[in-house]
Amino acid sequence: MGLSDMARTMATADVLRRCLDRWQDWQLATPLDSPPKMGALIAQGSGHSVYGIASTPQLIGRIRHQSTRLTDEAFSQELIIWSLAAQNGLAPRIVYADEKEQAVICERADTAAQAASGEALGTLCRRIYALPGVSHQLTLASDIEHYLKRLPAHLADPWRAAMHAGNAETALAALAADTLYLCHNDLTPGNLMSHGDQLIAIDWEYAAMGSRYFDVAIACEALPDSERGIMMRQVFGDALDDELMTAGKQIAGLVTALWQCCFAIDEAPSPAEWLGSSGY
C-alpha cells in the first residue's frame, strides 16, 4: 500500500468512526443496545471505500474517498433514489447518511452466488422502471463533455475525432428524445447483489430519469451474448426498438470508455477500438 493509499484509508476510517459515534441516531427497526464496532475494509472502488460494521443486524459503511460525481447535488439525489428503491425492495435500506461527509450506513446485502442471468437482470430493470419519477435527468452529452475535459488534449482529441466519425451526436439525440424512465444507469456486476432469492442493486450514484436503452446497454455489457437477447426481450418485449438499442449500445460503450480513461486507465479501450465496436 502506497503512502497516498494509506492516507486515504486512514481518512475514510476516521469518517466512518464519526458515523459510528452517532449510532443512537441510526434508523433501525430495532435500535442497537450498544455501540457498533468498525469491521474490516471489504472493498475499495474508484470512488468509495466499504467497511463492515460489527452489529446486529449486519450493516456496512460506504465512505467516499475520491469524487467521481458529475454535480454537487449528486449525493443528495442518489439518497433520494436509493431510499425510493429500498422502500420497494430493490436496494439495501439506508439507516444513516451524512451528506457533508458523503457517508452512508446501510443494511448489508449478500454477494450474488452466481452471475445474474439476462432474465433476472431484465426483471430488476423492469421493477426499477416502474418506480415513480424524480426531478433530475441523465445528461449524457454534458457528462461525456465533463469526462473529455478531465483528459489532457492528446487523449481527448482522438476521442472527439472518433465521436465525430461514429456520429455519436445522432445517437445522443435519439436517446435524448426517448421516453424517460427512472434508470439506475450503472447495473454492472459489482453493483448487483442479492436479498433472499431476489436481485437488488447498490451504488445509485448515476441513477436518474433517462432512456431505458442506455440503461439496458450498460447492464448488457457484462452479459454473455446468449443472455443479452433474453434481457432485452424481458424489458421491451415486442416493443424493442432496434435503432434505439444500437444508439444505447454505442453511447454506453463511449461513456464506459471515457469513465475508464478518467478513473481506470488500464481498462480503457482506444478510440479506434470503441469505434470498431460501434460498427464503424
Positions of predicted regions on the chain:
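ATP-binding pocket architecture of kinase catalytic cores
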Residues: 40-139
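Hydrophobic packing residues in well-ordered alpha-helices of helical domains and bundles
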Residues: 75, 121, 161-165, 245, ...
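An alpha-helical support segment within catalytic cores of ATP-dependent transferases
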Residues: 15-33, 133-185, 195, 241, ...
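Conserved N-terminal boundary motif of the eukaryotic protein kinase catalytic domain
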Residues: 32-41
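Phosphate/pyrophosphate-binding loops and the adjoining catalytic core of nucleotide-dependent enzymes
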Residues: 2-19
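Active-site acidic catalytic loop and adjacent metal/ATP-binding pocket
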Residues: 40-61, 170-214
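Activation segment
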Residues: 66, 111, 199-200, 207-209, ...
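Active-site activation/catalytic loop segments of kinase-like enzymes and analogous catalytic loops
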Residues: 213-240, 250-269, 276-277
